Amino acid sequence: MIQVQTRLQVADNTGAKELMCIKVLGGSWRRYANIGDVIVCSVKEASPGGVVKKGDVVRAVVVRTKKGLRREDGSYIRFDENAAVILKDDKEPRGTRIFGPVARELRDKEFMKIISLAPEVL
């Protein structure tokens, strides 16, 4: 569960290292985001020479959460960190590589490019 002010790691090679959620998209009173949801973030930490700089406002999709999520078969999937992938305007990833595992639920939300770039889909 990601809410406003939550810090997330970046799971791609855009140059950003840490993001802070500033808005959960999908309704005026929506408070929490889960895996597969799009959020608006501010870049809090970035490496020099990257595509994005510190202070940039970007959209990102949540790919891993500590809270985890319940699947239809009753099983749960949970990760060690909160992580997101920075998106372009057409919901394609801005980077060319994805680091770490991603959840299978991204396929249902039609983030097929992220699924294909990820080294592991759980």
Swiss-Prot record:
Annotated GO CC locations: cytosolic large ribosomal subunit
Record keywords, A-Z: Ribonucleoprotein, Ribosomal protein, RNA-binding, rRNA-binding
GO molecular function: large ribosomal subunit rRNA binding; structural constituent of ribosome
SUPFAM superfamilies attached to this UniProt entry: Ribosomal protein L14
InterPro entries: Ribosomal_uL14, Ribosomal_uL14_bac-type, Ribosomal_uL14_CS, Ribosomal_uL14_sf
Listed GO biological process terms: translation
Gene3D superfamilies the UniProt entry points to: Ribosomal protein L14
UniProt-listed Pfam families: Ribosomal_L14
Entry superkingdom: Bacteria
Subunit structure of this chain's protein: Part of the 50S ribosomal subunit. Forms a cluster with proteins L3 and L19. In the 70S ribosome, L14 and L19 interact and together make contacts with the 16S rRNA in bridges B5 and B8.
Function as written in the Swiss-Prot or TrEMBL entry: Binds to 23S rRNA. Forms part of two intersubunit bridges in the 70S ribosome.
Family under the similarity heading: Belongs to the universal ribosomal protein uL14 family.
UniProt xrefs under NCBIfam families: rplN_bact
Record's protein name: Large ribosomal subunit protein uL14
Organism: Symbiobacterium thermophilum (strain DSM 24528 / JCM 14929 / IAM 14863 / T)
